[in-house]
Amino acid sequence: TSLPIIIIPAIISFLFDIYKYKLNIMKFTNTLIKGKLIKRYKRFFTDIKVNNSIVTAHCPNTGSMKGLLDKDNTVFLSKNDDPKRKLKFTLEIIEANKKLVGVNTHRANKIVADGLNKGLIKEFKSIKNIKPEFKFSSDTRFDFLCDKNIIEVKNVTLLRDQKVAEFPDAVTERGTKHLKKLIEALKQGYKPFVLFLTQIQGINNFKIAKDIDLNYYKNYLIAKK
């Protein structure tokens, strides 16, 4: 029995400042703020030019963000005025190569959860119980347990040829570990899935970037057998 691989495009539309997954609309709380990227540094920080000011925004993506970080790329920020927050702005989307790319990895699970709850993902239309952050073992958590289905979500932001999204954008030991653990779960009677959420505007094709992480690619092939 092979490990099912699911690829879901999350279409980003700025006509309404929303995330859109098929018929499902997931609105941002507030209108996004447009700016220009100056730089990203220390993984979690980005300097953004908004009008005539420079603001520091939280970068909620710890990956390499390969191909997205060119200076002066258009970006979209969300704003939170909670006084407890050190940074009021969060980097949500970057426009690169004329494509809008959702870079907030925290939103990936929210998009999938919304799709699960509303029955928009055909593989899981009949599920009854959705449990986020499923603890599979002492050192491994998966994103969702839906009845006996384990779902691990991977956020996809890499686009190198304008037609095909790719994962990963850097070597991912954690991703490889997840594949191996999902194979273990299969042997234990679970039905595990890898769900690649492609947050790139207008892209429906996907492949593994084997030139970036050959080990992940090899384990991906093992999982598919």
Feature locations, PLM:
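Short, charged beta-turn/beta-strand-edge "cap" motif at the junction between a beta-strand
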Residues: 39, 79-84
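Short nucleic-acid-contacting surface segments enriched for D/E, G, S/T with interspersed K/R
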Residues: 63-76
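Low-acidity, Ser/Thr- and Arg-rich intrinsically disordered low-complexity segments
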Residues: 1-2, 13
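Conserved catalytic cores of phosphodiester-cleaving nucleases, focusing on short active-site segments
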Residues: 35, 142-169, 182
